[in-house]
Amino acid sequence: LSCYLGYKHSQTCPPGENVCFVKTWCDGFCNTRGERIIMGCAATCPTAKSGVHIACCSTDNCNIYAKWGS
């Protein structure tokens, strides 16, 4: 499985990590810089905390950040 780690930068996931994810949230600079974004591979879909959005998928490079487009 390959997952995006950043804008148009993907990497093959380590063994046992079969889920791609995008984690987004706002911090104090959200109004000027936009959402904070973490992308990558995981063994299971991370648990979202209040104010954090997480999207998971399980096909190659499926974790596209919607505001960047494809």
Curated annotation (Swiss-Prot):
- Asked if the record carries the keyword Cell inner membrane, the reply is no
User: Mind telling me which SUPFAM superfamilies this protein's record contains?
Assistant: Snake toxin-like (SSF57302)
- Any one Pfam family here would be Toxin_cobra-type
The intrachain disulfides are: C3-C20, C13-C41, C26-C30, C45-C56, C57-C62
Regarding tissue, the record states: Expressed by the venom gland.
Q: What is its main location?
A: secreted
Q: InterPro entries attached here?
A: Snake_3FTx, Snake_toxin-like_sf, Snake_toxin_con_site, Toxin_cobra-type
Q: Does the keyword Mitochondrion apply?
A: no
Q: Which GO terms describe its molecular function?
A: acetylcholine receptor inhibitor activity; ion channel regulator activity; toxin activity
Name positions with the PTM Serine amide: S70
State any GO CC term: extracellular region
Q: Where in the cell is it found?
A: Secreted
Q: Which UniProt keywords apply?
A: Acetylcholine receptor inhibiting toxin, Amidation, Disulfide bond, Ion channel impairing toxin, Neurotoxin, Postsynaptic neurotoxin, Secreted, Toxin
| Family membership | Belongs to the three-finger toxin family. Long-chain subfamily. Type II alpha-neurotoxin sub-subfamily.
Protein's job: Binds with high affinity to muscular (alpha-1/CHRNA1) and neuronal (alpha-7/CHRNA7) nicotinic acetylcholine receptor (nAChR) and inhibits acetylcholine from binding to the receptor, thereby impairing neuromuscular and neuronal transmission.
What is the name attached to this protein's record?
Alpha-elapitoxin-Ast2a
Question: What species does this protein belong to?
Answer: Hydrophis stokesii
